[in-house]
From Swiss-Prot:
<dbReference type="InterPro" id="IPR001451">
    <property type="entry name" value="Hexapep"/>
</dbReference>
<keyword id="KW-0012">Acyltransferase</keyword>
<dbReference type="InterPro" id="IPR018357">
    <property type="entry name" value="Hexapep_transf_CS"/>
</dbReference>
<keyword id="KW-0220">Diaminopimelate biosynthesis</keyword>
<comment type="similarity">
    <text>Belongs to the transferase hexapeptide repeat family. DapH subfamily.</text>
</comment>
<keyword id="KW-0677">Repeat</keyword>
<dbReference type="InterPro" id="IPR013710">
    <property type="entry name" value="DapH_N"/>
</dbReference>
<dbReference type="Pfam" id="PF00132">
    <property type="entry name" value="Hexapep"/>
</dbReference>
<dbReference type="InterPro" id="IPR050179">
    <property type="entry name" value="Trans_hexapeptide_repeat"/>
</dbReference>
<protein>
    <recommendedName>
        <fullName>2,3,4,5-tetrahydropyridine-2,6-dicarboxylate N-acetyltransferase</fullName>
        <ecNumber>2.3.1.89</ecNumber>
    </recommendedName>
</protein>
<dbReference type="Pfam" id="PF08503">
    <property type="entry name" value="DapH_N"/>
</dbReference>
<dbReference type="GO" id="GO:0009089">
    <property type="term" value="P:lysine biosynthetic process via diaminopimelate"/>
</dbReference>
<keyword id="KW-0808">Transferase</keyword>
<keyword id="KW-0457">Lysine biosynthesis</keyword>
<comment type="function">
    <text>Catalyzes the transfer of an acetyl group from acetyl-CoA to tetrahydrodipicolinate.</text>
</comment>
<dbReference type="Pfam" id="PF14602">
    <property type="entry name" value="Hexapep_2"/>
</dbReference>
<dbReference type="InterPro" id="IPR011004">
    <property type="entry name" value="Trimer_LpxA-like_sf"/>
</dbReference>
């Protein structure tokens, strides 16, 4: 998996068409209304639903007031530069409510739980779980077979573009409500205890805890048993 360069992300945002997409429920004498090809109109003679850019649909509503009895507009963004990731081809388990922006890479058999937020340029390795309400900022990178606990934050770095993003290596377990600051690398096989604030690199195969996080011990068999990654949670249905 390739991490996006910060300048690539900045260029993408700068050049992207800023959009305000809306869904509009509409009723009236719709046989008298003409809809342009840029607006998706699923309508019959009396009612229907429109999908499109607000700047275009607003004009239709204004110009056809005498034919439109009522309408309701659903809108969840304004001048948005980055669309949501198309999830249909992703070979991972992604639960409802997860917010995943375009240009995120998700490995096979990863798990993204409810209300996780994953920003542009983030990378999630195969078999890793991002738990409920966790946040992966721009360019944050999680290796294979990791667990990022509920409410954890991996800080994002898009500007300044020279800054190093958070890197979590393979087989890492990050507890609930952990904060990992920009530029930190969490080494392979490490465990970060719940609630820790990680300001410095974490050596491989160590346990860190506290605010700021400090090494409290090396990984031992007891720790391995308590932080085991269960592959059963990552299994998908066989492809048809």
């Amino acid at each position: 998996m390739k991490m996006m360069d910060a300048n690539e992300i900045i260029s993408f945002i700068q050049k992207s068409e800023k959009k305000t997409p809306v869904k509009v429920y509409i009723k009236g004498d719709l046989k008298e209304v003409t809809f342009p090809g840029t607006v998706q109109a699923f309508v019959n003679k009396k009612a229907g639903v429109l999908f499109g850019e607000w700047s275009e649909i607003k004009v239709i509503l204004e110009e056809n007031k005498k034919h439109i009895a009522d309408y309701v507009v659903e809108n969840d963004r304004r001048n948005s530069a980055i669309p949501m990731l198309d999830l249909k081809g992703i070979k991972a388990r992604i639960e409802p409510g997860a917010i995943i922006r375009d240009h995120v890479e998700i490995g096979d058999n990863a798990v993204i739980m409810m209300n996780a937020t994953i920003n542009i340029g983030a990378v999630i390795g195969e078999g890793s779980m991002i738990d409920m309400n966790a946040v992966l900022g721009g360019r944050a990178t999680v290796g294979k077979n990791c667990h990022v606990g509920a409410g954890a934050v991996l800080a994002g770095v898009i500007e300044p573009p020279s800054a190093k993003p958070v890197i979590v290596e393979d087989d890492v377990v990050i507890g609930a409500n952990v904060v990992v600051l920009e530029g930190v690398t969490v080494g392979k096989g490490a465990v970060v205890a719940a609630g820790a604030i990680v300001t410095e690199d974490v050596p491989p195969y160590t346990v860190v805890a506290g605010t700021p996080a400090r090494v409290i011990k090396k990984i031992d068999e007891k720790t391995k048993a308590k932080t085991e990654i269960k592959q059963e949670l990552r299994q998908l249905n066989p492809e048809k």
